[in-house]
Every structure is written in C-alpha cells, then in structure tokens.
Amino acid sequence: MKKILALILALVMALSLVACGSKDDNDTPDDGKKTNTIKVGLICIGDENDQGYTYNFIRGKEAATEALAAKGINVEWVIKYNKGENDDCTNANIECAEEGCQLIINNSYGHEPFMLKVAGKSEYKDIQFIGCTNCASRSDDLENTHNAFANIYEGRYVAGVVAGMKLQEMIDNGDITAEQAVIGYVGAFSFAEVISGFTAYYLGAKSVCPSVTMKVQFVGSWSDATEEANAASALCDAGCVMISQHSDNTTPATMAQTKGAFHTGYNNDMTGVAPDASLIGTRIDWAPYFEYAIETVFNGGTIDQDWCKGIADGSVVMTT
C-alpha cells in the first residue's frame, strides 16, 4: 500500500509542479522595478490557532505576499480575526474599507450577506470584495463583488482512494470484515459544498474498496472544536473505523487517534496532532488565487467574477 500511496502522491505533485511552472504574459509586470503598495483586507472566521481553516488562509496569504514582492508589488495586510457570520463581519468590512483597503477578502461562506451589505454602499463601489467559497456574485448586480473557490472535490476523491486502500488492506489482513469497512464523515452543514465533497470522497473509497459504506454527521457549525470532536466520537462508537471531515478544526483527527480509528484530513497536515491515525489530507492552496487577484487589482484590471481551479492548477494540494 505504501508504494501505491507514494505513486498517487507523486502523480499529484507532478501535476502541481506543471501548474506552477506555467505562466501567462500577465504574470510579469510591465516594469520589474515597481515598488508600489496595495492594501488588502482579510476577514477571517477564526484565527491561525485553529491549525485548520483560517490557518490555511494565512499560509496562502504569506506565500502570495512573497510571490508578489518578487514582482515588485508590496502588500499591506489589514487582518480581522474571529469575525462571526453576523454584523461583526459587516463592521469588519467597513473598518477595512475605511482603513484604505483596495481589496477586501472574506474567508467564510456565511460572511457573504454581510459583505454584500457593505459592497453595495455607493461610497465603497471602487473597492473590490471577494467572498471565498461563496456564490452570490454571479447573480447579484454589483460589479465589485467576486466569488472564489477551488475544486476541492478532486482532492477529496484522492483522499477517498487512500482511505479505501487502507480499508481494503484491513479486510485482506483479517483486521475487519467487509461489512465493517465503515467511514464516518464529520460535516459542518448539509450544503452543496459539503455534500459534493463527501460524495467525491465516498466514490474514491468505493473505487478500491467495493464494500465500503459511510455515515455522515453534521455539526451545524463550520468551526466548533468540541462538537466536531463529539461527532467523530459518536461515529467511532457507531462502528466507523475511518474518519474524515469537512469542518475547520483538528479535533476529528485527535478523536480518531483516541478511538483507534484512521483519519484523512482537510485544510492542514494532521500527522502532527494524530500521527497514528492520519493517512493523508487535502487542502485548498489559496496562494495562486490571492496572487492573481491582488496583482490584477494592483494593475487596474478586472478580477474574474467566478474563479475556481483544481489540482492541475496548483490550487488543490494533498497533505501527508
């Protein structure tokens, strides 16, 4: 199994390297000596201490900042941490706008209606607003709003294949029966984003372990470490020997470790918190999008209304 897993990772890395090595003419600024500064706001539902969802955004921000600096574009960030899906988000968007941000990025699905309230104000019409994982820009009448996501289902399918390989190995070794090949999936909400992800994951697992079944438990929050742990615990107690997640924290991984189950992760490498349980994970690499969006605004261009890339473009990566 280790040889097959290594081959899968090598193929994914090869695709990512090809993506990173290909640039279009717009990747090079007209003047390599530009030293201008652009101010960008980033509104986060959590903070980097979650070691998951928001931490992944911070990692993308840092990589994009470094790449842009090499092009002569300096980014000054205004970051608002721990802003809920409520009027805290509204106020954070206003604060970023009043502090002179030319581009404001909101990192949670539930931030969208509060971001739109600010983006629609006439005094902010020249500021660009991005809703990560959102969808309204395609149908609203605002020219300064944009959606951004990635084809994370691609990474979930690969992670599902790895989970299925482990389950089939356990069956072949007599550790479990075919009927005991049960996956538990901790989901935040029953939204299309989550459903498409666990569907891809299940199909990946079933492609190599035909007897696999899956139980899904929703926790009603993107980021509730306690409820995520409780859901993972309940799934293990219900007979699940493999745990995965579409939620923000590391607690499903640590609970899988505690319960003696395996785990495939999201947003970050989970081997540090669950070394015996963690097999593989997948995450969105936000650096390519941040670099593209910031450079476009800096150069006076127009950001795509809807942006979504995948493994081949380096926007979805696997973690171990």
Model-derived segments and spans:
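Positively charged n-region of N-terminal signal peptides that target proteins for export
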Residues: M1-L11
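Alpha-helical transmembrane segments and their juxtamembrane interfaces
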Residues: V12-M13, R138
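A residue-level marker of the well-folded mature domains of exported/periplasmic proteins
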Residues: D30-T320
